[in-house]
Amino acid sequence: MGQRKGEIMSNIDKYEARKKMVYDFMCDDMYVPMKIKELCIVLGVKKEDRPQLEQILLDLQAEGRITLSKRGKYSKSEIKKTVGVFTAHQRGFGFVTVEGEPDDIFIPAEYVNGAMHMDTVEITISPVTTGRRKEGKIVSVIERGIKQVVCTYEASDNFGFAVPDNTRFGTDIFIPKERSKGAMSGHKVVVEITSYGKKGKKPEGKVVEIIGHIDDPGTDILSIVKAYDLPVDFSEKIMHQVQNVAKDVTPADMAGRMDLRDWMMVTIDGEDAKDLDDAVSLYMDGDNYVLGVHIADVSNYVQEHSALDVEALKRGTSVYLVDRVIPMLPRELSNGICSLNEGCDRLALSCIMTINKKGEVIDHKIAETVIKTNRRMTYTNVKKILADKDAAVIEEYKELVPMFEKMAELAAILRKKRMKRGSIDFDFPETKVVLDEDGHPIDIKPYDRNVATKLIEDFMLIANETVAEDYFWQEIPFVYRTHDKPDSEKIAKLSTFINNFGYTLHIGADEVHPKELQKLLMKVDGTDEESLISRLTLRSMKQARYTTACTGHFGLAANYYCHFTSPIRRYPDLQIHRIIKENIRGRMNDNRREHYESILDAVAKQASETERRAEEAERETVKLKKCEYMSNHIGECFEGVISGVTEWGFFVELPNTVEGLVRVTDLTDDFYEFYEDTYELAGSATNKRYKLGQKIKVVVDSTDKIMRTIDFKPAE
C-alpha cells in the first residue's frame, strides 16, 4: 500500500515538473506562439506522451497562465495579474479581496487551484458583463495565510485526523501518530500545518498544543481565543515593568496640571466595569453648558517604545468575549492607577467644552488635569433617576440629580443636532449572554440601551469630534477615525432593492448623503421590512477604520472624528494622547512631527486590523453561546418575527436576539415558491405565505456548535 502511494505521489510530482517546464518554455523571450504539433517536435514529446501534453496545456489554460489563439497556437497569457487575499467558502468557491477594488472577486470552485482560506494569491480577472460581479481564476498561491489552525482531534490506530473548527479551511488535516502529542479523540488541539497537500493529498500537520476536551468548561471559548491568535498572558518583563508603576498620584505628578479635584464629576459605567477610563462633569455658564469629558491619562504610565507599549500596539484593543475580557493593558494598570475610581486622585486628559443651546461648541480647552470623581455611578441608577424617577435612588444621589438633569438636557440637544445633519443610528439590539459559574449560558437577552448609555455616548461623540477638529486645523500628525462614503454601485443596488417596497433614495452626483439613509431608516422603523432593509443598508456601507488623513465619518455625518475617550482599551486613543500632550507642552518640533509622520500609518493599519479580529472573535463567542443555550431548549416553542426570506427558507428572530432558520424542506404542507420582489414564500396550492415581519411560532429543531447555526421548525 505504502509503495503504491509513493508511486502515485511520484507521478504527480513528475506531472507538475513537466507542467512547469512547458510554462517556463513559453515564458522564454525567444518563444513564438506554436501549435501542439510544433510543441511536440520542439519539446521532443513522443506520440504516446502527447495526451499528457494536451492535459498540461488544458491545465495551464484553466489557470489563466497561457492562451489558445483562434489559429490554434499557444502562448503565455498577457492578462494582467492581480494580488489579493482569498476568502474560502465551505462549498468550494471563494472570493478574493483586492486593495482598491470596491467589490471582492468571485472565484468559482474549479478555479481555486489549491488555494486555502486567507492565502495571499495571484489571480487573473475574467472579462465581465456590465452589472455582473467580477470573476477570476487563482493562478498561484504567493503566501499561505494560515500556519496554525484550531481543530477537533479524531484518533485512529496509527494516525489521526484534525477537523478544523473553521469550516472555510475546507478539509481535515492528516496527523501522523508520532506528531499527535498524545491527543485523544474529542480533544481541541492547535495544529501547525507542515504540508498544504497537493492534488489528491490532504494537508499534513502536527499537534503543537492540546487546549482541552471538547466537553470541558471553557474549552469552547479558549478554542476561539486560539483560533484568532489573541494574546492572553503578559510577559514577565512587562509585568515587572507594571510592578514599578506608582500606585498613587504624587504631588510631583500633579505639577503643571489643571487641578479639577473640586469639580463635581462622576463616572457612569456598567455594574461589572472595573476599568473606568472616562468621567463627566457639567455646570452652567449663563445659558451655556460647560461639559467636561475627563479621560484617564494612560500615556503617563505607558511610555512610548517600552515593552508595555509594544505589547499594547500588538494587541491594538481589549477584546470583550462572553465569559472574559482580554485586556490591552495589564489589569494592574487598567483597574488600578489608570482607573478613575471614586474618591481617588487621578491624572487625566480633559476636553472641556462650552456648548450653547443649539448644541454648538463655542469654546473648548484640552488640558492635562488632576481629578477626583465624586461618585461611581451605574447606567442602571442614572436611568432610575432620569427615566424611572425612582424616589429612593434620587434621594441617595440628591446632590448630583440637578447635574444629571442638565446632562440629559444637553445630551438631547446634541443628539437632535447630530440627527439634523444626517447622523445614522443603526439601533440593532446587542446581545447580553448571562453565564453560570461553569461558563454555560443560563439567559440571553437584548442589551439595555437606555437614557444613561445614550447620554454617555452623546458626550463621548462630541469630545471626539472636538479633539479631531482642533488637531486637523493645527495640521499636526494625528490618527483619525474614518468612515468613507459608500461605493456608488452598492448604493445603486440598495436603491433598486428598496423600490420593491415603495421606498426611494435621492442619489446626487453618484453619491448619497447620510441624511438620505437616515430618512430611509426612519421610514422603515416599525415596518415588517425594517430588519431586512436596516441590515442591507448597513452592508452597503464601508467599515470604519483608522487613518492619518481626516476625510470625515459618513455614518455620523461628521467632518472631523477621532477616538480620544478610551485609551485603556484602544491603542489609537493612547497614541493621540501622546501627541496631544507633546503639543500642549510645546514639544511638537519638526523632529517629533517627522517621527509621528513616519509611524502613524502603520499604527492606524495595525489598529484597524486588530479591531476587526476582536470584533470577529467577539461575534463568534456570542454565536457559540446562543447555540449552546438553544440546545438546552430543543423541542420548545417560541414566538418570533420573520427577519429574512430566501429561496431555501426563512430566518426567525426571537425577542432575545437569537436567530434561526426554518428550511423550506421542513414546510411539508405545500410546495413553496420564493418571490424575490416581495421577499415572500408562497404555497402554490394553499397560497399560505411567509413574509418579512410576520409573527410566527417556531419549535427549536437542532443546533450546530461547529457551524454556529440554529434550525427551527414551524410550530403549527
Residue ranges, per PLM feature:
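Charge-lined substrate channels and their catalytic hotspots, especially those that engage the 3′ end
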Residues: 2-292, 299-345, 383-384, 679-681, ...
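Electropositive polyanion-binding surfaces
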Residues: 41, 195-196, 223-226, 230, ...
